[in-house]
């Protein structure tokens, strides 16, 4: 498999209200993708911030492995093997559910969505995050693929200076989460290691 990928980033890293714009194009034998990602961090006061991520993507493909994902990626979505993941398939040899580690890619919704919400054409998502306390961040997000939509909200718990993040979904397009034994399968996490 051969891929060509190009990107351009413009960022304003000012102390107050920094933002960045990322433009990416990806071409493979069976697909072409293009997207624009906007990240904006609005300072409400000295301690409170509202972070916003907007995503607009386009894909042209007949192979659903290259569809734009509504949810954040897991290891099995990384078809270019460019990300660090604990598990890349669903064999579960590490006793970690393969879909619980997330990579904020494409749509980036923190809860797992049905594959029917992925797109082989266009996808738009927006997510916001507010720092409630030093330990808890409240997030809300929504996305549309041109026909159907998904949305959700929950808590993010940053640990170890944001190297480990735990995502606890509370509400999604399917309603309020059931906090029973099955809830542990809905919890997602991300790991950021600079090796």
Explain the meaning of each model-derived region.
Residues 155-163, 170, 182-195:
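Outer-membrane beta-barrel "beta-signal"
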Residues 138-146, 155, 171-174:
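Active/binding-pocket-proximal capping segment
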Residues 124-129, 142, 154-158:
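Conserved C-terminal beta-signal and adjacent last beta-strands/turns
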Residues 1-131:
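C-terminal outer-membrane beta-barrel translocator/porin domains of Gram-negative envelope proteins
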């Amino acid at each position: 498999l051969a891929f060509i990928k190009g990107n351009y980033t413009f960022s304003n890293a000012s102390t107050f209200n920094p933002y960045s714009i990322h433009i990416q194009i990806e071409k493979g034998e069976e697909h072409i993708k293009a997207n624009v990602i906007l990240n904006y961090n609005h300072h409400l006061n000295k301690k409170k911030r509202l972070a916003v991520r907007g995503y607009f993507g386009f894909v042209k493909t007949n192979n659903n492995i290259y569809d734009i994902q509504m949810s954040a990626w897991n290891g099995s979505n990384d078809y270019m093997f460019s990300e660090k993941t604990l598990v890349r398939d669903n064999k579960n040899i590490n006793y970690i559910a393969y879909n619980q580690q997330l990579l904020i890619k494409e749509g980036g919704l923190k809860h797992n969505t049905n594959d029917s919400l992925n797109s082989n054409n266009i996808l738009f998502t927006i997510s916001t995050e507010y720092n409630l306390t030093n330990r808890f961040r409240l997030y809300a997000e929504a996305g549309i693929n041109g026909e159907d939509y998904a949305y959700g909200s929950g808590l993010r718990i940053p640990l170890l200076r944001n190297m480990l993040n735990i995502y606890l979904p509370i509400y999604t397009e399917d309603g309020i989460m059931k906090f029973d034994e099955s809830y542990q399968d809905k919890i997602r996490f991300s790991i950021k290691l600079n090796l």
